[in-house]
């Protein structure tokens, strides 16, 4: 794999296990990972790209029975074969809808929404800023409560007011996804927070924040937390998977 001094490949295909078909590429373009900067290539060209990690792990499952994948994610219930990248989850509010990294569509109409983190969680969350745009509270609106999510509403208000502070976990993003699922009639769908763990003090803090937020929301939403390391451990022991897929992931991310 050739790359430059910035750790970026010359072509997107060089960063991926297998080329993307046109439909998958169109889905990925709904996000911002393929947008180049003024002096920098698109983030998806970086060896440490979160988008490349998502594609390399999940694109294999497009059109396949996703039962082993759901099991590896710790999600129970029936699995389908349809997988969507950068799936929009409209909240009913003005502006572009939030997108979730992966949506696994089940045959009963529900979906499993996967929010993926590679190294993003290691960057500390900014302090002294309002974490939601005004539209989420415009005119005293309680959008999560109106969608049947009062615990999410309480957490959103605590985050906005600074009563709940998190160093590593992007909880507002999870709350937006929970709102999008609920507004679209998918409240019983699972929301998975999947991250690439790294040892150290930051990891312990991140885990503690996750445990605290899950405890606040678990009675209301099906929020599952797992690591890429745990996911790969299960997948690598699953019979019937293409060895090229498993070997690529092991060499690239888990050696």
Regions found by a protein language model. Give the residues of each.
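Charged, terminal alpha-helix-loop-beta segments
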Residues: 1-255
């Amino acid at each position: 794999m050739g790359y430059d001094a910035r750790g970026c490949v010359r072509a997107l295909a060089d960063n991926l296990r297998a080329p993307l078909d046109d439909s998958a590429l169109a889905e990925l373009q709904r996000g911002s990972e393929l947008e180049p900067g003024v002096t920098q290539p698109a983030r998806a060209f970086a060896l440490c790209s979160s988008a490349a990690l998502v594609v390399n792990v999940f694109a294999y499952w497009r059109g396949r029975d996703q039962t082993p994948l759901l099991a590896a994610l710790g999600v129970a219930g029936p699995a389908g074969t349809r997988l969507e990248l950068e799936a929009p989850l409209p909240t009913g509010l003005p502006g572009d809808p939030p997108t979730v990294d992966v949506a696994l569509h089940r045959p009963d109409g529900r979906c499993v929404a996967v929010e993926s983190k590679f190294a993003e969680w290691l960057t500390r969350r900014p302090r002294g800023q309002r974490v939601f745009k005004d539209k989420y509270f415009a005119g005293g609106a309680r959008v999560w409560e109106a969608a049947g999510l009062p615990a999410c509403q309480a957490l959103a208000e605590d985050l906005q007011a600074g009563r709940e502070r998190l160093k590593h976990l992007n909880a507002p993003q999870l709350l937006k996804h929970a709102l999008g699922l609920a507004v679209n009639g998918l409240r019983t769908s699972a929301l998975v927070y999947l991250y690439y763990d790294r040892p150290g003090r930051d990891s312990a803090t991140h885990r503690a924040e996750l445990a605290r937020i899950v405890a606040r929301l678990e009675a209301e939403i099906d929020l599952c937390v797992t690591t890429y390391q745990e996911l790969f451990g299960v997948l690598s022991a699953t019979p019937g998977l293409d060895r090229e897929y498993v070997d690529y992931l092991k060499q690239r991310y888990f050696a």
